[in-house]
Amino acid sequence: MANSFINKKADLTTTDLTTLYTVPSFKTAVVKSLIVSEDAGSGSTITITLVNSSGAIFNLFKDKAIASKATTELLTNPLVMEESEVLKVQAADANELHVIASILEIQPREVVS
């Protein structure tokens, strides 16, 4: 199977921790872009974490400010994620933030003997 570009989107309507993306079995993922936009006009903050396959939590962005009516690209370099790792997002305020991740999913090559 070929590699594929996908995107994952979330309208953060609550302040709950929300799963944005989970790397499928037998794949590696490269997050190429992570865009957050604020549409309420008051500004907000977002926390983004990566959870590895053992359940350890790594903060990528903690209370990152997103300006009023602004769109912010959070990544300056691609983020590599391994099988079963999870990208989670959490808004400080409900109904203010949208998140879009652009992702390349990589399928390992099959070895034929």
Question: What kind of region is each of these model predictions?
Answer:
Residues 1-29, 33, 90-113:
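C-terminal interaction-tip segments
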Residues 26, 69, 83-84:
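Tight coil/turn sites that cap or link beta-strands
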Residues 36-41, 92:
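Short solvent-exposed strand-capping/beta-turn motif centered on an Asx-Ser/Thr pair
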Residues 41-63:
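Short, surface-exposed beta-strand/strand-loop-strand elements in extracellular ectodomains
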Residues 71-78:
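Exposed aromatic-hydrophobic patches
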Residues 78-96:
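Noncatalytic modules at the cell exterior or secretory-pathway interfaces
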